[in-house]
Amino acid sequence: MQDTIFLKGMRFYGYHGALSAENEIGQIFKVDVTLKVDLSEAGRTDNVIDTVHYGEVFEEVKSIMEGKAVNLLEHLAERIANRINSQYNRVMETKVRITKENPPIPGHYDGVGIEIVRENK
């Protein structure tokens, strides 16, 4: 099954990071979420109850990203995937990618970050 729902390029300001500068100044985090979901029923019925409401998913991600500061992106991504998988039975798999576009480390790059994939069991 190849059906997906995606939320791409969500941006949130937060104070996450292992470096003290990140905790003091904060930064913008870019989050992409991809959900593996069977969309065939929603395609037939044209009813939002037969799919996953991405507005609700956005609010779940926002509450975590703009919530209590943590050290690791890995921890944020795990919390997001767990929240989505526990709230939405239709989701078979959740992929979360979090990017720091301007972390306080030397170098030239478009961003640094992590990506995880978690099956909904």
UniProtKB/Swiss-Prot annotation:
It catalyses: 7,8-dihydroneopterin = 6-hydroxymethyl-7,8-dihydropterin + glycolaldehyde; 7,8-dihydroneopterin = 7,8-dihydromonapterin. It comes from Staphylococcus aureus. GO terms for biological process: folic acid biosynthetic process; tetrahydrofolate biosynthetic process. Optimum pH is 9.5. This is Dihydroneopterin aldolase. Belongs to the DHNA family. The keyword Zinc does not apply. SMART domains: FolB. InterPro entries: Dihydroneopterin_aldolase, FolB_dom, GTP-CH-I_C/QueF. Substrate binds at residues 22, 54, 73-74. Keywords: Folate biosynthesis, Isomerase, Lyase. GO terms for cellular component: cytoplasm. Catalyzes the conversion of 7,8-dihydroneopterin to 6-hydroxymethyl-7,8-dihydropterin. Can also catalyze the epimerization of carbon 2' of dihydroneopterin to dihydromonapterin. Pathway: Cofactor biosynthesis; tetrahydrofolate biosynthesis; 2-amino-4-hydroxy-6-hydroxymethyl-7,8-dihydropteridine diphosphate from 7,8-dihydroneopterin triphosphate: step 3/4. Gene3D superfamilies: 3.30.1130.10. Homooctamer. Four molecules assemble into a ring, and two rings come together to give a cylinder with a hole of at least 13 a diameter. Its EC number is 4.1.2.25, 5.1.99.8. Pfam families: FolB. The active site is at 100 (proton donor/acceptor). GO terms for molecular function: dihydroneopterin aldolase activity; isomerase activity.
